């Protein structure tokens, strides 16, 4: 499954066939190939790529040796893609084609501590008719002596956001290889400047326009 690392620049819109298309601009690559894993030596086929330069003085000795063995400068981020065997010494945006379906993974924006209405879309309590200080409460969270506890996974107030989120089957609208830019239709998780992982769509089908 081919993939590349990049940075979310932001959203804009472009005109295509007299239609405005909302797109997310991603600055992707070039990502140097740090390691190629084979079935003979590692038990599976994969490629490890790096992204975002890192000062050598901030890299520990084992990782310095890892990068030196590959003959590439140290990078801040390393990711592995199985079943991907690109040519050359780096991965660029031209691994994808316009119209291709991809999956985008990012870290969602942190929202801090939120209640059940914002976090889980609960309806809350009545707005009036005797309701007092119950407008945004979740309601009952359990039973009685049996089971005598709150079940694991119960949807309650708490920290929201800052989670790994993947949006599937996004369309590649345009590729600007000279600028290392990919324009993807729709929204991608995370704030501007955040790390984005772009992969071939895992669930795309020919009926949906996947490749």
Curated annotation (Swiss-Prot):
GO aspect biological process, one term: translation
Molecular-function GO term, any one: rRNA binding
Keywords: Ribonucleoprotein, Ribosomal protein, RNA-binding, rRNA-binding
Cellular component terms per the entry's GO annotation: cytosolic large ribosomal subunit
Region annotated Disordered, chain positions: 125-148
Domain of life: Bacteria
Keyword flag Cytoplasm: no
Pfam families in alphabetical order: Ribosomal_L3
Subunit structure: Part of the 50S ribosomal subunit. Forms a cluster with proteins L14 and L19. Also contacts proteins L13 and L17.
Protein function: One of the primary rRNA binding proteins, it binds directly near the 3'-end of the 23S rRNA, where it nucleates assembly of the 50S subunit.
Annotated family: Belongs to the universal ribosomal protein uL3 family.
Protein name according to UniProt: Large ribosomal subunit protein uL3
Taxonomic lineage: Bacteria, Thermotogati, Deinococcota, Deinococci, Deinococcales
